[in-house]
Every structure is written in C-alpha cells, then in structure tokens.
Amino acid sequence: MIKRMLTAASVTLILSSGFAQNNTIYIELLGNGLLYSLNYDRMVTDKISVRAGYGGLTVSNSTVSSGVIVTEDIKITLIPVLANYLRGEGNHKLEIGGGIVLVSLDYTGNVADVDFSLAADGAIPTGNLGYRYQKSEGGFFFKASLCPFFAETMVTSVGLGFGYSF
C-alpha cells in the first residue's frame, strides 16, 4: 500500500513540473511530520501547490526486569503528501490544504534472548491551515500552520516551516 501511495505522490509531483518554476525545500518542525519533516513543495499554479515530505523517529530502550534484559527499538517513518490552495496577494498567503500522511511502524525487541518484531503500515488523513510567506522570485520561505490529523480522534499539531524557494 505504501509503494502505491508513494508512486501516486511521485507522479503528481512529476506531472506538476511543467506548470511552474517555484520549487521549495524546507524543514517543518512538528506539523504533519510529527516531530520534524524535510519537504519538497512545488507550485502547480499561482494558487495551487503540492507537497511531499519525509519525517522519522527512532526510539531505543533497554531495561532489566527480574534479572532479564529487555531491549526495544521503535522506528516510525512518516511521509506527508498534501495539496494546498493559496489565497492572498503578494508574498503573504493563507494556505489551506489536505492530504494524507503515510505511516510505517517497525517494532523490534528481545526478551531473554528471544527476538520478536511487529510492523504496520497505514495512512492518516490530514490537513493544514495557516500562513505562508513566499516570494514569487524565490528566496527565504516561511510557514506557520495548524495541522489536524483525522484518526479515530482528531489530533491537531502546529507546524513551523523554514526553507528556500527557487
């Protein structure tokens, strides 16, 4: 499922490459990528952009319980893929977007020399609503947004993005 979604996101970005010259590379703290994400954003028209990113987190833990060593590793990979509508004049825009976050979870552990693992993949619908500063001629890029995740319960994060448009 993840491979099909990545293919769809790649095709979207490739097809949009003929319509505009505005590319942006930026880092978003928190937001749609959980703790952080590295993102590529492409302007399709002067009001529409598409975005794909990569974020991840690895946590390792070792404990001793009743004389038994327990080790655990959790790796979470997040790939936000969104389309955005931009409203406003000049360099200052309101950004409204929606898409999905592809999630991959790998859990491995060892208890008393017995290895075990668990892996899961999925997609979480997401959105964003916020402010975007981007010059049409390129240069410094900034965004601040609210990023809801529509899982069993809605969870909202805030995101701050800094980067470069070219």
Regions picked out by a protein language model, each given a short descriptive name:
Residues Q21-N23, F140:
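Short, surface-exposed connector motifs at secondary-structure boundaries
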Residues T24-N39, G55-T58, D121, C147-G159:
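Solvent-exposed loop/turn segments connecting transmembrane beta-strands
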Residues I2-A8:
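Sec-dependent signal peptide recognition
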Residues S165:
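Polar-ligand-bearing catalytic/cofactor-coordination segments
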Residues Y26, S37, P80-L82, T126-N128, ...:
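Membrane-embedded beta-strand positions in outer-membrane beta-barrel channels/transporters
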Residues D41-L146:
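Gram-negative (and chloroplast) outer-membrane scaffold detector with strong preference
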Residues S16-A20:
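Sec/Tat signal peptide C-region and signal peptidase I cleavage site
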Residues S10-V11, L15:
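Hydrophobic alpha-helical targeting segments used for export or membrane insertion
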